Amino acid sequence: MLAWWMLLPTLLAMMVALVLPGFMWLRAGGRSSLVAVAAAPAFTFGLVTALSVAYPALDIEWEPSTALPVLGLSAIGGAAAWALSFFHRSNGGFSLRGVPLREAIGVRVPIGGAQAAVRASTWGAILVGFLVAAWPLLAGADPANPVQQWDPTFHQNGVHAILYGKDASPFGGLHELYGGRSVYYPTGWHAFVALFARYDSVVQTANVSSLALMAVWVIGLAA
């Protein structure tokens, strides 16, 4: 279990990267916080896929230093859009009408006790659901051991190929796994995991991504 605790920073970093960029934009669009958290990973994977296609054409290597800042900028842009959206809804438009900004925005109305109880019970159920889903992996597996099936071996080698080749494109990024031939294969997961893996930690990072995706799955069910 201690080995899993040592990987907690990686899990938290993955969850931030999965949720934050899309969460801001979805909140700007008026979605609830639960729906925004549930749908945000799809936004992030869409952005990761778009970058993985664009970077080879721009001769940009696929690395944390080149991809993660774009995710961060997306979150900042979404936060700005959310702030403007909130201001527009609260003020009935963008004009201050001669009053201070704080007064124009107004004080957010606190949620009632019943709504707070619903939120707490919902997120509590999500936590329980995640622990139920994750416990067999946490209690029965060493994160340094690959999953004992043939398919994970292919996908972990795909992450290795991206780390070595610096190319995460679905149009040839995994060519080393196909005898050097450039074939189409969706690489969203591989590209994302490669942002958090080192050459000697692909298996551990892949296993941590399973925990992150469990959380996404449970939150999606709740939403």
Task: List the predicted regions and their residue ranges.
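Internal/C-terminal transmembrane anchor helices
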Residues: G112-L137
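Membrane-embedded, hydrophobic transmembrane alpha-helices
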Residues: M1-V118
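Generic detector of short, locally flexible boundary/turn motifs and exposed helical patches
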Residues: L2-W4, S121-I126, S201
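Active-site lumenal/periplasmic loops and adjacent helix-entry segments of GT-C-fold
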Residues: V128-A223
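Core alpha-helical transmembrane segments of integral membrane proteins
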Residues: V35, A39, T122-G124, V216, ...
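A residue-identity detector for tryptophan
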Residues: W4-W5, W25, W62, W82, ...
